[in-house]
């Protein structure tokens, strides 16, 4: 019994000594309360590409680090996966909530189609596009001191999901690749021209028309947006290329837009063509914040091998070097 008592007493004494040692030699430092994020100093209105986290939540969180509050439309009027956003309500909300903001980042796909997925079906008419252009002009007229940063996405090479049939989609993809190769060829071969005609004959006419119309209507809209940038309605326009390949009709549209940009004598500060879609709003946020702070970051690229710059990665329409630069 005495041994148990002695052992317990010894354990208590050791605990007291250890506690005293820590208190004397390792005192707890008094903490200084800090805020989690900087104080909000400015606000940016955002109409996101769609409601997924990379397009909306990531932008909101990144902006808070810079002391910026992002104002976004209510989720009730935004897209929800395959359900398009309410475009008229979104335009109305934008007009009513832009006052007091220092800038606006606007997804054309959301304002016109109701999101990225809806834009791939392109159910909107030329008249709908005309009304959107009129809305952007009205927005700039009403708030001329608030810079508008808009972005639009080229249709991807993949046919819309509403076009059924594995063979039909396969032929459309082959048609798209071949049409682009012929467009850039100095002298296309008779075999290539013959194959293109054969593909046109085996693809159902309504599907071929819908596929071609995706790009022609998008090119028409992008040209008008480029002209808004030239005229000062848009402070900057970014055109992104989503899910591309080395050859495809999206590349042909891009070359057409580049010619239009050169005709208007615009530079990258007016209209910027890039690769990707989801990250464009974040990139525009970084651009706005860098401009605001007078910061110009320097970037150095180091490749893991000599062949890497010339590789074309899946879903990309250009080499790694072109994409990185």
Which sequence ranges carry the predicted segments?
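Hydrophobic membrane-insertion alpha-helices, especially the h-region
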Residues: 8-22
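An N-terminal assembly and electron-transfer interface module characteristic of large anaerobic redox
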Residues: 22-325
